């Protein structure tokens, strides 16, 4: 008579718990979380925002079925020197950003920390330029300070 695959009985709880914990490692999401792989390879190193210097302005072509050039900037982060591409939101906002400006970037909010919508490979967006909110500059509420 073949044995049972799972222990059962009054004192089997510990064994069942250990078995469950062992098999959790087969789950990719659990493994990434436990080994800290998200923070390890994250340019922001787990922080919600980061400061950086604009290296260049770039246009990223939108994915199908859209045909557009999404305005982005290449940013070198101050904290670790890594270079990332950040999307510049709002119509005509790229005109308020020059090379060597200091910007603050945050995650763009795509699924599972990835890129959003039709912008391939872009995981961040610009929220501040030289310490002033990009939205405030765009609305005309504040002047962009010159450095």
Swiss-Prot record:
InterPro entries reported in the protein's UniProt record: NA-bd_OB-fold (IPR012340), Ribosomal_uS12 (IPR006032), Ribosomal_uS12_arc (IPR022863), Ribosomal_uS12_euk/arc (IPR005680)
Assembly: Part of the 30S ribosomal subunit.
Source organism superkingdom: Archaea
Biological processes annotated in GO: translation
Protein name (record): Small ribosomal subunit protein uS12
Role noted for this protein: With S4 and S5 plays an important role in translational accuracy. Located at the interface of the 30S and 50S subunits.
Key words, A-Z: Ribonucleoprotein, Ribosomal protein, RNA-binding, rRNA-binding
Keyword flag 4Fe-4S: no
GO molecular function, one term: structural constituent of ribosome
Family statement drawn from the similarity comment of this UniProt entry: Belongs to the universal ribosomal protein uS12 family.
GO cellular component: cytosolic small ribosomal subunit; ribosome
């Amino acid at each position: 008579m073949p044995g049972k695959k799972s222990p059962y009985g009054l004192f089997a709880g510990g064994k069942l718990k250990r078995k469950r914990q062992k098999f959790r490692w087969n789950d990719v999401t659990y493994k990434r979380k436990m080994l800290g792989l998200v923070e390890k390879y994250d340019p922001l190193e787990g922080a919600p925002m980061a400061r950086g210097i604009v290296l260049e302005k770039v246009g990223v072509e939108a994915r199908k079925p859209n045909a557009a050039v999404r305005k982005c900037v290449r940013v070198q982060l101050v904290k670790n020197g890594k270079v990332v591409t950040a999307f510049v939101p709002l119509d005509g906002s790229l005109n308020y950003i020059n090379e060597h400006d200091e910007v603050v970037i945050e995650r763009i909010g795509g699924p599972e920390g990835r890129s959003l919508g039709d912008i391939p490979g872009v995981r961040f967006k610009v929220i501040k330029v030289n310490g002033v909110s990009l939205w405030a500059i765009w609305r005309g509420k504040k002047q962009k300070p010159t450095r």
